[in-house]
Amino acid sequence: MDWTWKNPLPEEGRKISFVGKGGSAKSTTLAHLVRYWKAMGIPAVAHDADDSDGPEEPGSLLAWAEMLPVHSDGLGAPVYRAPAAPSLRAEMDRLRPPHGLSLVDTKAWDRGKHNSHLAAIRASDLLVLALYPSGMEKWRGASILGAMDEVESMSGHRPRVVCLLTRFKKGVGAAGEVRKELENEGLYVLKAEIPANESKTGYSQSFGTVPRLKANSDMHELAKELLVEATR
């Protein structure tokens, strides 16, 4: 298959951060996305800001990249340990490829002033909020909007935010109900969704492997949709 996709990104590229609670599939989703963007001809770099296990331990995205064979092209994009929060925006700008993406994988959502989340909001053009479709997620959406209000009041910058529903069982009504609740709150929910897949070849079991590409899969559709959203 010809994976080529007309690159819609401007010369200065775009910066996208992924946020959400622990276990919301941020790292898994991002690992697969960079593989798809590589196949589609979209250059990218990723910054792992997940220091949940301590600043000396690699976050899951960086650990994943380091597990892959050296003779392979890895995840399809270089993965770097993110710098301290005050330097995040400058580093994202410095490493962002022309007409490409500079991506951040954050740790579990926490709006504390000394972690990477407020820095990721300040640095990004687009914020992807990964949400498991449960009743609590409406509250999490309100929390991140509150953090964005805080960043905007301090810096005048407010990135576009989109919600991504993840890790749910297809055919269960909860995802649709949460989608409606979020939309009623004025949040934009991506059409693409990433359901739970516990099979041997599914997303949930793919850590440490080279993500597989499948045309028109959930992840492929998400890769295309995010490119459109990044240029709005």
Residue ranges of model-derived segments:
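Short beta-strand-centered segment that lines the nucleotide-binding/catalytic pocket of NTP-utilizing
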Residues: 40-61
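Beta-strand-loop-alpha "switch" segments that mediate conformational coupling across diverse proteins
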Residues: 167-209
